[in-house]
Amino acid sequence: GQTVWPDHDMFHSSDTICGSLMARSKAISGGPVYLSDSPSDFIPDNILPLIDESGKIFRPSAPAIPTLESILTNPLQSGKDYRVSAPTGDEAVSIICYNLNTSPIHKEVKTFVSPKDYLVPKRTTGYFPADSILVFNWKKQTAEILATDKEMKLKGFTDCLFHLCPIRQGWGIIGIQEKYLSPATVQLLSRTNETLTLNVLCAGTLRIWVESQGKQELRSILIKKPGKIEISK
């Protein structure tokens, strides 16, 4: 198991350039979260997606690491995207794609997410093959089947957070959409072809992908308090 967890250092939630970017980097790093703002300057929109109502941090199952093609990349000067991934929750993999280039020449870079991004972490986390892979764009709050590489552009000093969620027995479990690490907000208790039982760890909007009788649906379920929930197709 993981014996050392990194400390990703402090950040300012009120930083107008990269406050939200740094918050997401803290989330996927798995390290502690601490702020350098004056409390009067705290930006709740950047802080609350990190934690539950009691202040407990939603963490990945292991610290994020660079994806294979990013290991030897200088993210500030390469002119390329920089990507990191971490296993999250019971079954998902979370990925952040960055444009961290400081030169105006590289104001826009191409990046991607791939079904292969889900396959790499399974070697160490015990994941097993899925029927298909769902990709959830956290910023846009949209989901789609990821059958091939999905390319996009990152404009400016920015990032994009994705969750790759396996679809098994017609269920794709995303989690609470308001939290950065959505898959870490739920625990899978049981799953059949007809029902899904979860332990939801915080209030918010639960997003579940459902496939039944040839139809696909991205459901939004309002969760008012943490606890066990059973969902039927």
Where are these regions (language model features)?
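Glycan-recognition surfaces
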Residues: 1-44, 65-70
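Flexible loop/turn segments at secondary-structure boundaries
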Residues: 11, 34-35, 41-45, 67, ...
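A general structural signal for short secondary-structure junctions and capping/turn motifs
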Residues: 14-19, 23-27, 49-50, 83-88, ...
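Carbohydrate-binding surface patches
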Residues: 26-29, 34, 72-131, 161-168, ...
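Generic, well-ordered alpha-helical scaffold segments in large soluble proteins
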Residues: 27, 31, 50-54, 138
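Active-site-proximal helices and loops of the catalytic beta/alpha 8
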Residues: 46-65, 69, 125
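Contiguous mid-protein beta-loop-alpha structural module that forms a pocket-lining wall or clamp
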Residues: 135
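C-terminal beta-strand-rich structural cap/linker in extracellular carbohydrate-active enzymes
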Residues: 145-188, 206-208, 215-233
